[in-house]
């Protein structure tokens, strides 16, 4: 079987764009660091082309055997393609047992067919990090953080349920305590009075503000008839021509005595005439009859 059978042809279109983007992520400085590390451990020269020197899998198998003796039982020195692929497969299995995560490991074709050298480099960096974690002196990669396990007694765990974490905020200021669901009935009362049951709905809680100033007391639904009068006079409901003092001042210009548009108006002075009277038909307009409301005497 010839080696040309395993080599892919040039990529075109979208495949070429993907291959170029992967090639742009390749770090040549890290390649030099990996070269020095592998050559220092194995004692073998990789060659001018880093990936071509690793393609047969021989150096990779010897490398993992140095880090973890006995990882690869047999290293194939043959130049046959399937032997080289077998070496790469044995290396992948060995580093998996060594502790490298599966998502950090390249596939055999990424190296053998030159499809993704960036992933091969990432795998070697992950292997360096794992070797550093295990105590090997490596100048490449970063050391993985060690687990810091903590064991708590069941009583401590139960006590933690009664504590409000700072991430939940504070309960010392204004809150939604006492709020009910939208549309449900609310009972308003002053909890300082010491009453167990809420009072009637006409009682306004001090938490809702004061009802000593202007309010909407006596307001009716839109469109209904309104009876306006002065409750301080002790009178019952008067006609709608009298305006209550709660509606403002009636000493200046006002709409006092105004009626609905189109209705007759009764105009008189309440200081002199308690009830309005109208002149009879044919009677002079300016006589001094007692019931005449034009009389100003």
Curated annotation (Swiss-Prot):
GO biological process, one term: actomyosin structure organization
Tissue: Smooth muscle, and tissues containing significant amounts of smooth muscle.
Transmembrane segments: none
Keyword Repeat recorded: yes
Keyword terms: Actin-binding, Calmodulin-binding, Phosphoprotein, Repeat
Sequence ranges of the Calponin-like repeats: 164-189, 204-229, 243-268
Ranges for domain Calponin-homology (CH): 28-131
Record PTM Phosphoserine, positions in chain: 175
Listed GO MF terms: actin filament binding; calmodulin binding
Pfam families: Calponin, CH
Family statement drawn from the similarity comment of this UniProt entry: Belongs to the calponin family.
SUBUNIT field: Part of cGMP kinase signaling complex at least composed of ACTA2/alpha-actin, CNN1/calponin H1, PLN/phospholamban, PRKG1 and ITPR1.
Purpose of the protein: Thin filament-associated protein that is implicated in the regulation and modulation of smooth muscle contraction. It is capable of binding to actin, calmodulin and tropomyosin. The interaction of calponin with actin inhibits the actomyosin Mg-ATPase activity.
Record protein name field: Calponin-1
Lineage, highest ranks first: Eukaryota, Metazoa, Chordata, Craniata, Vertebrata
């Amino acid at each position: 079987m010839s080696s040309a059978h395993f080599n892919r042809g040039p990529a075109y279109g979208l495949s070429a764009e993907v291959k170029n983007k992967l090639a742009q992520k390749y770090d040549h400085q890290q390649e030099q660091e990996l070269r020095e590390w592998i050559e220092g451990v194995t004692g073998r020269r990789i060659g001018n082309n880093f990936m071509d020197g690793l393609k047969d899998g021989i150096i990779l198998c010897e490398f993992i055997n140095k880090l973890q003796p006995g990882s690869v039982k047999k290293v194939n020195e043959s130049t046959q393609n399937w032997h080289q692929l077998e070496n790469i497969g044995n290396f992948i299995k060995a580093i998996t047992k060594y502790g490298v995560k599966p998502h950090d490991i390249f596939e055999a074709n990424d190296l053998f067919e030159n499809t993704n050298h960036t992933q091969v480099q990432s795998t070697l960096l992950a292997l360096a990090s794992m070797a550093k974690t295990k105590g090997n002196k490596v100048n490449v990669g970063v050391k993985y953080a060690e687990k810091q396990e903590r064991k708590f007694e069941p009583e401590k765990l139960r006590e933690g349920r009664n504590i409000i974490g700072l991430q939940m905020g504070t309960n010392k200021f204004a809150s939604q305590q006492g709020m009910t669901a939208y549309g449900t009935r609310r009972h308003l009362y002053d909890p300082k009075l010491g009453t167990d049951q809420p009072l009637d709905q006409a009682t306004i809680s001090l938490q809702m503000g004061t009802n000593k100033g202007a309010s909407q007391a006596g307001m009716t639904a839109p469109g209904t008839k309104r009876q306006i009068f002065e409750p301080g006079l002790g009178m019952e409901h008067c006609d709608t021509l009298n305006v209550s003092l709660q509606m403002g001042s009636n000493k200046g210009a006002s709409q006092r005595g105004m009626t609905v548009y189109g209705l007759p108006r009764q105009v008189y002075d309440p200081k002199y005439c308690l009830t309005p009277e109208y002149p009879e038909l044919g009677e002079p307009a300016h006589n001094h009859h007692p019931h005449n409301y034009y009389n100003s005497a």
